[in-house]
Amino acid sequence: MRPLARIRYGIAASLAAMLVAGAALAVPIVTKEGVLPFGTELGEDAAALPTELFATELAGGKRSYQQKLGDMLFSSPAIFGGVAKQAGMSCNTCHQQGAGNAALFVPRLSSRHGNFDTTGALFNPKTDNGLFDPVIVPSLRGAKNLAPYGHDGRFASLRDFIRNVVVNEFAGPEPSGEVLDALVAYVQDISFLPNPKMTSDGKLAAAASDAAHRGEAVFNRPFRHDASMSCATCHQPSNAFADGQVHDIGSGGRFKTKTLVNADFNAPYFHDGRFDSYDQVVGYFDKRYDLGLSAGERADLVAYLDAVGDASTPATTDTVQTELDEIAVFVTVLDTAIHDHNAAIVAVAVDTVGGEWRELGEHYPEAKNTSVTAGLKQRGAARVAVREMVLTLRQVDMAAARGDFHAAAEAYADYREQVAPATSALAAAEPFSLFDPSVRRQHFAALARLAELAK
């Protein structure tokens, strides 16, 4: 879930550059503490979320406690430090549902939407290299089989890569072995999305177009000036369309080969996001390697890349139930931590789950929000229910912190009893919430009008 409750919308920022475009809205924000630059966009306002599937469940199994702990930590600001923690950011802020984030923009750190400088001074001054070198936020789908890690492939293991992100990029404290193991287990379980146009061994299926099949031949054809090379040399179809190597393709250094699987949803492209489309990418390689492609061959190659990069259900509509389902996963971690008398994990779980509830409550506009006039009683009841859930969670944390796990278990039992009535209250108010497309449009249209008045 995206932590809207912890990343507060400053009036000046949210009104000065509000854009309304169907379901996709660009909402510049500042935090309550003002720690993020004016005009920051975290892409947390979309009505649909990237679909997230797990290899364990696709194989018919069930996710382990460790994987669920990693999932929860992935959405927790507690593992970061400095500005990121103050702003309520988490791994999930940038890697939404394990995917990328093409809407991300941080002034002075981003050259375009979808990239930012991970070695700039904002999040960790100690690792500031004095260069402006933004990189895209990569999708983590299929990461288990996509070593090495980092855009330049400097990390051989996913564990080292994750530690670097937490400690060096976002100034977090040194994570414990338990935390690192859990994050690795979670990321390794994030699966590629199914693609009916492709077979399991990287070949086109019958569902692919004729143009894509012609493009497949172009993709595998040797370059005219170097018969030892083809597109498939680096983007190996049988190896998730990658080769585990770094190469200098004239883009400013040596960078790892990106997978093409599900890449339709990974734009912008190249390490710095300089290209928006496959057509631009193909044009670059055609010129760089003097491939001599005809207009038809270029179009066919684009069709092939589009087929390889496709997915059957790339996004999932955000609803009350999808949010509650995620909270339920995180709560299982809290359950186990109480049983194990693990006060540290209880504290993180309460903070994270409480944040998820508060974010959920933000979808139900307050009475003073005059852009939403209907369902005032229902919205009020939903917000009260959310507050009660958060308060009960605090009782769990306070009891665990003083070592009274019997009291923590009792408070947790109270929490579980409150879930059903809270769910009913949220469901009753859903037609009057920002989960409803018409209410959402009305709400943000009102903010856009205020932005015009503020000019």
Question: Which residues does each PLM region occupy?
Answer:
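Periplasmic c-type cytochrome electron-transfer domains
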Residues: 5, 22-455
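Bacterial N-terminal signal peptides
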Residues: 10-22
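Positively charged n-region of N-terminal signal peptides that target proteins for export
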Residues: 2-8
